[in-house]
């Protein structure tokens, strides 16, 4: 059960702390002070979810002291994050619980952009309902630190594929890293890719880790150095261990910045009304990119329940810009940014980087797809192309759910590559929802497609020519993604002038997510276009 009342937060030496007892476990949270402006530039998707499984139950002050003495608080502060302490409520402690306890813990943790004191408020954008308070953390960066009895619990129960409440619904919640110190049982290793930090364990017990793909043996824990050299490399994204990029080694630069914009009249989502506000961003580019003149810009908008680093690190835009030599700028907290303000951000970026004004592109995932569509609707003249994914929002309302302004684009064609997940629990493809049909018909009209969508309605989907889109493309292409055992099926549609500037794609075996394979194909198509 989520917390329906905000837990009492108190100041403590070096930060803030709070605790809450759930039905199956007690959670204590220490939020160390830091110098980051996390509300402007959100580090959440890079931040580790530091879970300390206490061997014996301790009080809150003792937990805070442990975090500081070990250096876990320093790690958390580096990423504007927290240290979470867990102990079972069951009589008998760790010896009385199984993997369902871990699932219970993960269920009470969410990644939402608005947060304070390590707590997020979950307000469902679609149902307009408040769903509770949750501890803040990135489930796919779960790093577990365990000792003695709790280490035995991890060794017996968590070194395998685990299912539970993932980012946007049911999914895999397997931890990225498990640190086990002073084991007394032989680990039951059913999964070899989970990163293992074995501390102070005998050679005999360590034999159980033979064949593990990612392992570090230590006599004694050195938390900060172990994290920087080993732990921080790993994330468990949708059931697959992935490694973080080393930008220095790759010859890349990451810039952190913000733009102060004038608040537009249609901005009703700011937490507090203001005449102007900050818009944070992270920019990524190859060293030396600007040596030969203006460069293409891709501006990215994240999903509603995540931050800019989702598109950058998880979807992989950093790698696509590295391979294709363009400037990628990921906008932070864009849910507080209107299309007008996004346009203003682009204008400022043009003064900070040598941007080719004829090659400005936009992309977005989920609610970020909505922001990308808003730019298509309101400011098409600034765009050479768009690459939205995983959301086909209604046309005749803005991202904020308000009626569109008189700026609604009806005539300016803009190249589009859109992709959505075939197995998503949200409406991403026309066969999944009426609003999706509305969006596709709108694009067909604005981009002046040769093929007509006029007779396509959601009610008659059982008789559609194409079971996903209603109408088949002029050409169809399939691209297999071996990393996810999925196929991207692309329908290319020609416009009346003979130019193919519209691509609608579906991804088999994909839920509500954004994958690098899809965005690489999107860039391959969209990058051929530039404004006249």
Where is each model-derived feature located?
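Short beta-strand/loop motif that positions the catalytic acidic residue
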Residues: 197-199, 418-420
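A domain-start/cap signature at the N-terminus of enzymes
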Residues: 1-49, 97-107, 118-128, 140-147, ...
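A conserved short beta-strand
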Residues: 164-184, 381-396, 414-415
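Alpha-helical scaffolding within the catalytic cores
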Residues: 65-73, 182-189, 309-318, 345, ...
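Conserved acidic catalytic loop of the alpha/beta-hydrolase fold
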Residues: 102-140, 341-358
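Short substrate-entry loop that stabilizes the transition state in hydrolases
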Residues: 36-47, 52-95, 289-295, 300-336, ...
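Alpha/beta-hydrolase
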Residues: 52-54, 180, 301, 389, ...
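Conserved alpha/beta-hydrolase "acid-adjacent" motif
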Residues: 201-205, 425-438, 514-517
């Amino acid at each position: 059960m989520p917390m329906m009342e905000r837990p009492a937060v108190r100041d403590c030496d070096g930060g803030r702390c709070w605790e809450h007892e759930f039905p199956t476990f007690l959670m204590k949270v220490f939020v160390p002070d830091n110098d980051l402006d996390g509300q402007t530039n959100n580090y959440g998707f890079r931040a580790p979810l530091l879970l300390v499984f206490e061997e014996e139950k301790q009080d809150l002050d003792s937990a805070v002291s442990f975090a500081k003495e070990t250096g876990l608080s320093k790690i958390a502060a580096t990423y504007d994050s927290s240290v979470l302490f867990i102990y079972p409520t069951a009589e008998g402690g760790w010896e009385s619980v199984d993997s369902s306890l871990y699932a219970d813990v993960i269920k009470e943790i969410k990644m939402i952009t608005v947060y304070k004191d390590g707590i997020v408020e979950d307000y469902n954008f679609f149902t307009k309902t408040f769903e509770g308070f949750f501890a803040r953390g990135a489930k796919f960066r779960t790093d577990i630190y365990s000792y003695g009895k709790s280490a035995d619990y991890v060794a017996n129960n968590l070194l395998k594929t685990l299912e539970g409440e993932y980012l946007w619904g049911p999914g895999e919640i397997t931890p990225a890293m498990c640190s086990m110190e002073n084991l007394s049982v032989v680990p039951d290793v059913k999964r070899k890719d989970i990163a293992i930090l074995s501390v102070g364990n005998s050679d005999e017990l360590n034999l159980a880790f033979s064949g593990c793909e990612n392992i570090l043996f230590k006599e004694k824990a050195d938390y900060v150095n172990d994290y920087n050299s080993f732990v921080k490399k790993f994330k468990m994204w949708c059931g697959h261990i992935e490694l973080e990029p080393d930008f220095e080694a790759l010859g890349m630069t990451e810039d952190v910045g913000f733009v102060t914009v004038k608040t537009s009249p249609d901005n009703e989502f700011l937490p507090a009304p203001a005449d102007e506000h900050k818009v944070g961003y992270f920019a990524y580019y190859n060293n030396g990119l600007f040596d030969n003149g203006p460069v293409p810009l891709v501006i990215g908008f994240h999903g509603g329940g995540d931050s800019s680093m989702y598109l950058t690190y998880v979807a992989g835009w950093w790698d696509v810009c590295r391979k294709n030599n363009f400037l990628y700028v990921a906008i932070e907290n864009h849910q507080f940014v209107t299309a007008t303000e996004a346009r203003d951000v682009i204008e400022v970026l043009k003064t900070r980087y040598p941007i080719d004004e004829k090659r400005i592109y936009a992309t977005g995932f989920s609610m970020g797809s909505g922001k990308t569509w808003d730019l298509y609707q309101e400011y098409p003249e600034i765009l050479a192309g768009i690459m939205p994914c995983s959301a086909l929002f209604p046309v005749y309302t803005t991202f904020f759910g308000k009626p569109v302004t008189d700026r609604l684009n009806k005539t300016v064609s803009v190249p589009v590559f859109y992709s959505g997940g075939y197995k998503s629990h949200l409406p991403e493809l026309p066969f999944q929802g009426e609003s999706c049909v509305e969006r596709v018909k709108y694009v067909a009209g604005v981009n002046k497609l040769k093929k007509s969508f006029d007779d396509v309605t959601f009610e008659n989907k059982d008789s559609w020519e194409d079971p996903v889109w209603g109408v088949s493309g002029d050409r169809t292409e399939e691209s297999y993604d071996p990393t996810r055992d999925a196929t991207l099926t692309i329908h290319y549609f020609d416009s009346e002038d003979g130019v193919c500037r519209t691509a609608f794609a579906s991804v088999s075996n994909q839920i509500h997510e954004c994958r690098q394979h899809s965005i690489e194909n999107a860039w391959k198509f969209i990058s051929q276009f530039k404004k006249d």
